[in-house]
Amino acid sequence: MLLLLLSCNDKQAKVTTPNVLLSESQMVEIMTDVYILENAINYRRGKSISVNNLKTKGYEALFNHYGITDSIFFDNMDYYNENPLLMKNVMDSVCARFQKMK
């Protein structure tokens, strides 16, 4: 029983807050643009057009636009994925934004 309690405690201790924590609204903005970029990449891939340059340049432009690095983005993705309720809020907001775009 004690082992079970300790293992549960360890899981919660692994959730670390990034040095630069992006707000939910910032994550919604960024994730919306990530989905648009990924769809552009997948479209080109479907047309058998090289996507390496688009992917590299696209993410570089996206991170520059938001004033973040890839490390900040991925640290925040880890943080939000480790907090399912926060990530659900972000993704629900992203979906709502796309619904408004239709």
Where are these regions (language model features)?
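C-terminal motif of bacterial Sec signal peptides marking the signal peptidase cleavage site
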Residues: 4-7
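Bacterial signal peptide processing site
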Residues: 9-12
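Preference for short coil/turn "hinge" residues that link or interrupt alpha-helices
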Residues: 14-15, 61
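Post-signal peptide N-terminal segment of mature Sec-exported envelope proteins
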Residues: 16-37
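Compact alpha-helical subdomains of small soluble proteins
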Residues: 42-102
